[in-house]
Swiss-Prot record:
<dbReference type="GO" id="GO:0070401">
    <property type="term" value="F:NADP+ binding"/>
</dbReference>
<dbReference type="InterPro" id="IPR023013">
    <property type="entry name" value="AGPR_AS"/>
</dbReference>
<keyword id="KW-0521">NADP</keyword>
<dbReference type="GO" id="GO:0006526">
    <property type="term" value="P:L-arginine biosynthetic process"/>
</dbReference>
<comment type="similarity">
    <text>Belongs to the NAGSA dehydrogenase family. Type 1 subfamily.</text>
</comment>
<feature type="active site">
    <location>
        <position position="145"/>
    </location>
</feature>
<protein>
    <recommendedName>
        <fullName>N-acetyl-gamma-glutamyl-phosphate reductase</fullName>
        <ecNumber>1.2.1.38</ecNumber>
    </recommendedName>
</protein>
<dbReference type="InterPro" id="IPR000706">
    <property type="entry name" value="AGPR_type-1"/>
</dbReference>
<dbReference type="GO" id="GO:0051287">
    <property type="term" value="F:NAD binding"/>
</dbReference>
<keyword id="KW-0028">Amino-acid biosynthesis</keyword>
<dbReference type="Pfam" id="PF22698">
    <property type="entry name" value="Semialdhyde_dhC_1"/>
</dbReference>
<keyword id="KW-0963">Cytoplasm</keyword>
<keyword id="KW-0560">Oxidoreductase</keyword>
<dbReference type="InterPro" id="IPR050085">
    <property type="entry name" value="NAGSA_dehydrogenase"/>
</dbReference>
<dbReference type="Pfam" id="PF01118">
    <property type="entry name" value="Semialdhyde_dh"/>
</dbReference>
<keyword id="KW-0055">Arginine biosynthesis</keyword>
<comment type="pathway">
    <text>Amino-acid biosynthesis; L-arginine biosynthesis; N(2)-acetyl-L-ornithine from L-glutamate: step 3/4.</text>
</comment>
């Protein structure tokens, strides 16, 4: 018998990707998948790609999770904390929502609203010392999708003194799956196709998470909705230190990271190369004319930005190689 796994919030995009990864994992046994409005439906009627998984979606209730050794929470922001508080302390929990990412209650109230639920171990294992903290934890907060792409691009450069922590500017495009599966008029194909649209300009909720993890002191972030189902491409710029080689700094930082790839000089990340994988692709240079350091980061928002990273964290928590059940290679075209 494998490690018994429950997925809460299984009807959404991240939940569906979690189910796909768990079902193919050699050490995980999917015992429960729960949902709200879709409870009572057979799993394959909600996620047609999962035909062959003979499960009925259960109501989201702590009692339905009693037999699980490991629980993934793929719920909307603000809904994970109350449920997590009712789970046994020995149950390992990975929260894909934002409820437990931030240390600062003021930042939580300012960007999300409501009561701060407290911080869990932050699940970006490539940060210094973080893999060991995740391994020792029973509660892990999975990073946000944009936050993952930007932190992986920026954190080593600030830590090494290669980039100044002030005056960081980011523009990042994301596929529409990042907005969730709920029906919304502005996400209809007729609205999205052939269009690029910025949103939450200067006020995106991942800003405090990025600053917390990187040490950036000022960050201007413009997210852009792109006409594609999934993927994130982030362009991060900062003031460089004199004579810095940002590609070398990143290559050294991620030399032992199986899911972070610093591309050869002259090649730049693009979203299609990461789709279906748990990898983040990075490239960096210095714009001498503008005096700016530029890093481009690409990943699959549902993979490395959500479900894949959650499985990576779970692997570390239960003592498995972090690569177990995950692919470092994308599917293209």
């Amino acid at each position: 018998m494998g490690i018994r796994v429950a997925v809460v919030g299984a009807s959404g995009y991240a939940g569906g990707e979690l189910l796909r990864l768990v079902a193919g994992h050699p050490e995980f046994e999917l015992v429960t998948a729960t949902a709200h409005s879709q409870a009572g439906h057979r799993l394959h009627t909600v996620h047609p790609q999962l035909i062959g998984l003979d499960l009925v979606l259960a109501e989201t209730d702590p009692a339905a999770l009693a037999d699980a050794d490991l629980v993934f929470l793929a719920l909307p922001h603000g809904e994970s904390a109350a449920l997590a508080a009712q789970l046994p302390p020995k149950t390992r929990v990975v929260d894909l929502g934002a409820d437990h990412r931030l240390a600062d209650p003021y930042a939580w109230a300012n960007y999300y609203g409501g009561t701060h639920a407290g911080q869990w171990t932050y699940g970006l294992s490539e940060l210094p010392g973080q893999r060991e903290r995740v391994a020792a934890a029973t509660r892990v907060a999975n990073p946000g999708c944009y936050a993952t792409a930007i932190i992986l691009a920026l954190a080593p450069l600030i830590a090494a003194g290669a980039a100044q922590p002030a005056d960081v500017v980011v523009v990042a495009a994301s596929g529409v799956s990042g907005a969730g599966r709920a029906a919304k008029a502005h996400l209809l194909a007729g609205e999205v196709m052939g269009d690029l649209s910025p949103y939450r300009v200067g006020a995106h909720q991942h800003v405090p998470e990025i600053k917390q993890a990187t040490g950036a002191t000022s960050l201007s972030f413009t997210p852009v909705l792109a006409p594609m189902p999934r993927g994130i491409l982030a362009t991060v710029t900062a003031v460089p230190a004199r004579g810095v080689d940002p590609q070398a700094v990143l290559a050294e930082a991620y030399a032992d990271a199986p899911f972070v790839h610093v591309l050869p000089e002259g090649r730049w990340p693009h979203t299609a190369a990461t789709l279906g994988s748990n990898s983040c692709h990075l490239q960096a240079t210095v714009d001498v004319d503008a005096g700016r350091l530029i890093v481009v980061s690409g990943l699959d928002n549902l993979g490395r930005g959500a479900a894949g990273q959650a499985v990576q964290n779970a692997n570390i928590m239960v003592g498995l190689p972090e690569t177990t059940g995950l692919s470092a290679w994308g599917v293209t075209p």
